[in-house]
A protein has these predicted regions:
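Short, flexible, basic/aromatic active-site loop/helix in glycosyltransferases
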Residues: 134-171
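A conserved acidic beta->alpha catalytic loop
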Residues: 12, 34-45
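Glycine-rich, basic loop-to-helix element that forms the pyrophosphate-binding segment
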Residues: 58-78
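Short, well-formed alpha-helical segments that are part of the catalytic scaffolds
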Residues: 11-26
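Active-site-adjacent helix/loop segment of glycosyltransferases
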Residues: 206-278
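Short beta-strand-to-loop acidic/aromatic patch adjacent to the donor-nucleotide binding site
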Residues: 80-92
Length: 278
């Protein structure tokens, strides 16, 4: 039995489409749990009526990490699957046997705590994998260095082409938009850190898995399309979304990478100013 968790936030049509059109292609016996963030029981039941093949859980909107954890805990209590697919609802399969292949890869690489496919955006570019990047590189020097570095030097300095060059194997960070986790490893690692709201979960998961000796494995033999930001883009502007990302990543840098609160506050002030003139 495979577990599948979808965190849905006011995007019923996307969720219904994904369950009926994409997950219907999965040949492995599976149980789908939809965590309906921001819905009460009555509103969640309306969604459940449209996808009777799924379990729909109403939930307070405490973010992506908490929503996924809720779905995973339900699966652990009811089915105890060996693997759980954590997926957005704005995903389209671009290969045959996507999920089946990821499960096979996970089984053949027992060191992997999570396995991800090639994920491309609407522009055709890969969304990961990514290397580690420091707080200041990610949010300050990346932008302030532009007048001083040519395109080629900037590409090398910040490894901007890392996703396009990435080959099959272990990498620091994989996208959480479509990620197969080893249920036991995910549980032992402490699942996602619920202090984050949106963004930063994958970085923290990478560190948590590393602490128990597990890795993230990239399998580009199968591909999915991620219509990135289709949901959040309807509810938040670009600057608001960027600062939301920073605040979640601040949790990662503060508690997992040892940055001081003062350093993070200074970086946020500079980053906020940069966003105003971008």
């Amino acid at each position: 039995m495979l577990g599948v968790v979808i965190v849905s936030y006011r995007s019923d049509d996307l969720t219904v489409r994904f369950v009926r059109e994409e997950l219907a292609k999965v040949t492995i016996p599976h149980r789908v749990v939809v965590v309906a963030n921001g819905y009460d029981a009555a509103r969640a039941q309306q969604l459940a009526d449209r996808i009777p093949e799924a379990v729909v859980l109403p939930a307070e909107n405490r973010g992506f990490a908490a929503g996924n954890n809720l779905g995973v805990k339900w699966l652990d209590e009811h089915d105890r699957p060996a693997h759980i697919l954590l997926t957005n609802n704005d995903i389209h399969f671009r290969s045959e046997r996507v999920v089946e292949t990821l499960v096979e890869t996970a089984v053949s690489h027992p060191e992997a705590g999570a396995v991800g496919p090639e994920i491309i955006g609407p522009d055709g570019n890969r969304q990961g994998p990514e290397p580690y990047m420091s707080l200041w590189d990610r949010y300050v020097w990346m932008y302030l260095s532009t007048p001083f570095l040519g395109a080629e030097k900037k590409r090398k300095r910040f490894a901007l082409d890392y996703p396009s060059r990435a080959e099959a194997g272990s990498h620091y960070k994989l996208s959480g938009a479509f990620l197969l986790v080893d249920a036991k490893a995910f549980r032992e690692a402490g699942r996602f850190d619920e202090r984050t709201f949106l963004y930063g979960e994958e970085n923290i998961l990478s560190d948590r898995l590393a602490r128990i000796g597990r890795k993230l494995y990239f399998d580009p033999s199968v591909t999915v399309l991620h219509d990135h930001g289709q949901t959040i883009g309807r509810h938040h502007g670009d600057r608001e979304r960027a600062l939301m990302q920073f605040d979640s990543m601040a949790c990662y840098y503060r508690y997992y990478r040892g940055y001081s609160a003062l350093s993070i506050a200074a970086a946020r002030t500079l980053y906020s100013s940069i966003l105003k003139v971008k």
